[in-house]
């Protein structure tokens, strides 16, 4: 691995105006969506900030392995330039990170020390992305936003290390990404694609079979289901949430403003699974206060209808419904600007897009 040092542009296209340190008091009333509550924020190299978790044999799964996290990170586009998402000494055991491969921001993993590198899937720079690496006994699998992005033959057992685990760094590879990491989960079982998709948009705060630890980074580096608490250390590290606003303003060429509080955007892709999205969806037609349309390819070819419904009087939730006339991949992002709560929906390519009828979407009433 190699690193290019120097001044880094720290990202977060949606948070340029505000960088607010999070206190535990603030977090008490934060609703849950994607990402969840607050997140770990990193300034990128040459800063050194990260979360350190003391060594424990449980952090070295050997027979089966799943690592997953939400990330919104950047690295340098020149050279190979690898940055750590998390690791337990890449020279001896496992490491998950972002590397520039062929000019693309690529998910890389090591599961058996320094000779075990595998590249598969691309991580959108500065855009919240769910990444997962799975070992099921015979294969290593990379997932991006629930899509299988790489499959590699792998035999067990996985190797171990007595080094501490780090999030945002590694004891043998200290270059830090710029951006944010949230909801880090480590399992000693192989999670399936269906299990990843069913749970990456839900908080986990109770023990489950095979779940070793969960670090939600809601103002601290505690493990919320077990004893593997971490601690932030170094420079340029902290916790953030989305900034809040009185309203979402007006609908723009690329963003719907619904019910005066929900900023809704979409991105689409026709390239292979696990690669970067091709473009931003454009607002189509004439939206109203509660619903609107998006187009991908041309103004006379509408793709998605989305609406936000006030269900507060029924189940104390705002509802998000959508319908699409497409079979391409897209991601639909809904941000409640009043509370700084986001929900992301994915449509996977191939079959016609199913309708979304999410009556529990956002617990942000009134």
Language model: regions and residue ranges:
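Bacterial N-terminal signal peptides
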Residues: 14-27
């Amino acid at each position: 691995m190699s690193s290019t040092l120097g001044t880094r542009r720290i990202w977060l296209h949606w948070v340029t105006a505000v960088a607010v340190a999070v206190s535990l008091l603030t977090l008490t009333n934060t609703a849950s969506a994607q990402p969840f509550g607050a997140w770990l924020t990193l300034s990128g190299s040459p800063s050194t900030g990260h979360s350190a978790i003391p060594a424990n044999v449980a952090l070295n799964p050997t027979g089966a392995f799943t690592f997953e996290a939400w990330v919104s990170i950047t690295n340098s586009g020149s050279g190979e330039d690898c940055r750590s998402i998390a690791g337990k000494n890449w020279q001896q055991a496992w490491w998950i990170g972002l590397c520039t491969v062929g000019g693309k921001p690529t998910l890389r993993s090591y599961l058996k020390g320094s000779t075990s590198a595998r590249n598969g899937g691309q991580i959108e720079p500065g855009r919240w992305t769910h990444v997962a690496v799975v070992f099921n006994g015979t294969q290593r699998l990379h997932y991006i936003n629930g899509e299988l992005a790489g499959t590699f033959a792998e035999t067990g057992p996985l190797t171990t290390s007595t080094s501490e685990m780090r999030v945002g760094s590694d004891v043998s590879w200290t270059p830090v990404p710029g951006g944010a990491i949230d909801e880090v989960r480590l399992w000693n079982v192989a999670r399936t694609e269906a299990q990843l998709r069913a749970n990456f948009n839900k908080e986990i705060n109770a023990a489950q079979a095979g779940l070793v630890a969960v670090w939600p980074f809601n103002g601290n580096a505690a493990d919320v289901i077990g004893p593997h608490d971490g601690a932030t250390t170094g420079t340029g590290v902290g916790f953030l949430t989305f900034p809040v606003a009185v309203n979402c303003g007006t609908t723009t060429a690329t963003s719907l403003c619904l019910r005066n509080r929900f900023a809704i955007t979409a991105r689409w892709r026709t390239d292979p699974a696990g690669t970067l999205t091709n473009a931003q969806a454009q607002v189509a037609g004439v939206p109203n206060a509660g619903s609107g349309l998006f187009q991908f390819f041309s103004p006379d070819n509408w793709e998605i209808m989305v609406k936000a419904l006030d269900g507060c009087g029924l189940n104390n939730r705002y509802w998000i419904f959508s319908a699409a006339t497409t079979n391409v991949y897209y991601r639909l992002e809904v941000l409640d600007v009043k509370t700084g709560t986001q929900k992301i929906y994915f449509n996977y390519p191939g079959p016609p897009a199913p309708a979304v009828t999410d009556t529990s979407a956002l617990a942000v009433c009134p």
